[in-house]
């Protein structure tokens, strides 16, 4: 019985941390774009940081044999509805939306799911946050669930048909977070791909 219990525990642990399988499809959403610049810090625009990271994540996933879908691959505006339609129509297995946060003061990285998210959404978000933490963050602000009826129940999480999360990759308004983002961009992309 003890042997069976240990074997079962090992199987459960392996399943929780199993990497994405070759042949699966991940939809990568670079937030904002075109006239929608997102948050800013001087001449630094969130839309540009999101796209740089999205392209790096795409390359890392492809190197692992994982199919990718980009909601945008250049500086164009794509509506939230069209982002979700792309992921749903192409039957992505996972959806991750990449963003930068902003505030008068504040730093750190956080990942959002829906309030009362299905276990797969939470697992995806927790695995990504753990992997990013291993690279290094100014502050781990954790995995957060949106509150029904408010803006933090992000449209893309609500309207995609697969496990999804929205990652806020540091505060664009914080110089320390920007330095980490620039220094670790490739490592963050690899961490997301491995999560």
Give residue spans per PLM region.
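Catalytic-core environment of secreted peptidases
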Residues: 20-42, 96
């Amino acid at each position: 019985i003890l042997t069976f219990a240990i074997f079962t525990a090992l199987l459960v642990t392996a399943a929780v941390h199993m990497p994405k399988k070759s042949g699966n499809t991940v939809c990568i959403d670079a937030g904002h774009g075109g006239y929608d610049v997102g948050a800013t810090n001087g001449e630094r625009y969130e839309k540009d940081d999101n796209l740089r990271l999205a392209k790096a994540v795409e390359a890392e996933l492809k190197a692992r044999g994982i199919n990718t879908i980009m909601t945008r691959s250049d500086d164009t505006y794509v509506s939230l509805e069209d982002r979700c339609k792309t992921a749903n129509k192409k039957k992505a297995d996972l959806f991750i939306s990449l963003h930068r946060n902003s505030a008068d003061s504040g730093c750190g990285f956080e990942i959002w799911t829906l309030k009362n998210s299905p276990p797969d959404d939470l697992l995806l978000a927790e695995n990504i946050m753990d992997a990013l933490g291993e690279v290094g963050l100014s502050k781990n602000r954790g995995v957060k669930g949106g509150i029904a009826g408010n803006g933090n129940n992000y449209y893309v999480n609500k309207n995609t048909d697969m496990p999804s999360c929205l990652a806020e990759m540091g505060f664009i308004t914080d110089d320390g977070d920007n330095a980490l983002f620039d220094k670790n961009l490739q490592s963050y992309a690899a961490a997301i791909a491995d999560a």
